[in-house]
């Protein structure tokens, strides 16, 4: 399957708040929710919804998610925790978490249009895996800085996770360490995704 480009509000109505996909949040207690979610939920449906949450939040294709699950399965630690760490260390997600982009699709666009440097080199692959001590900056031109400046001004500095730091004056972010489970920006049961 390809990347989802359709109506975002339909997805957040069905799956709940997905901060990486859109800033909007679903209305609580809507009639649509009662219509769709009547009756007992089956185990398959619960697992599928958790997987879809992960896919739509991080903007992954089905094949990319399967590849990440396969890599996480080879690790000696908890598969679910390794999966979340792999997804959180993607360049597009780190830009979103730093506040340099309002959504993950917006961060993907910044990376694809070559506005972002990692350790002084242009990176145009959104799935680039960042490592601790990586420095993420923008190009020196005014257009790149203006795009980042608008996003940083509208972001909440209190939501910055502990594994990242940002210098808002120089438009520079630093990955300090690999993230802990409690700082993941999405409420999800990753074990259900692995079981699916």
Curated annotation (Swiss-Prot):
Pfam families per UniProt: Ribosomal_S4 (PF00163), S4 (PF01479)
Span of domain S4 RNA-binding: 89-150
Any single GO CC term annotated in Swiss-Prot or TrEMBL for this entry: chloroplast
Region (Disordered): 17-36
Location(s), subcellular: Plastid, Chloroplast
Keywords: Chloroplast, Plastid, Ribonucleoprotein, Ribosomal protein, RNA-binding, rRNA-binding
A GO BP entry: translation
Chief location: plastid
Keyword Chloroplast: yes
NCBIfam families in UniProt: PRK05327.1 (NF003717), rpsD_bact (TIGR01017)
Sequence similarity: Belongs to the universal ribosomal protein uS4 family.
Protein name as annotated: Small ribosomal subunit protein uS4c
Species per Swiss-Prot/TrEMBL record: Pseudosasa japonica (Arrow bamboo)
């Amino acid at each position: 399957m390809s990347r989802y480009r359709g109506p975002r509000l339909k997805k957040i109505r069905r799956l709940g708040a997905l901060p990486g996909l859109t800033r909007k949040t679903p209305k609580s207690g809507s009639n649509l929710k009662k219509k769709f979610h009547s009756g007992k939920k089956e185990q398959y449906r619960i697992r599928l919804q958790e997987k879809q949450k992960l896919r739509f939040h991080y903007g992954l294709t089905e094949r990319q998610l399967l590849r990440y699950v396969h890599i996480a399965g080879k690790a000696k630690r908890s598969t679910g925790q390794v999966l979340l760490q792999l997804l959180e260390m993607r360049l597009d997600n780190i830009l979103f978490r730093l506040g340099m982009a309002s959504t993950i699709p917006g961060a993907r666009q910044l990376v694809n249009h070559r506005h972002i440097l990692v350790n002084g080199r242009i990176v145009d692959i959104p799935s680039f895996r960042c490592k601790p001590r990586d420095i993420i900056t923008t190009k020196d031109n005014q257009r790149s800085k203006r795009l980042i400046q608008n996003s940083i001004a509208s972001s909440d500095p209190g939501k910055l996770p502990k594994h990242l730091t940002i210098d808002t004056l120089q438009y520079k972010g630093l990955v300090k360490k690999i993230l802990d489970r409690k700082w993941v920006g999405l409420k999800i049961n990753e074990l259900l995704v692995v079981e699916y």
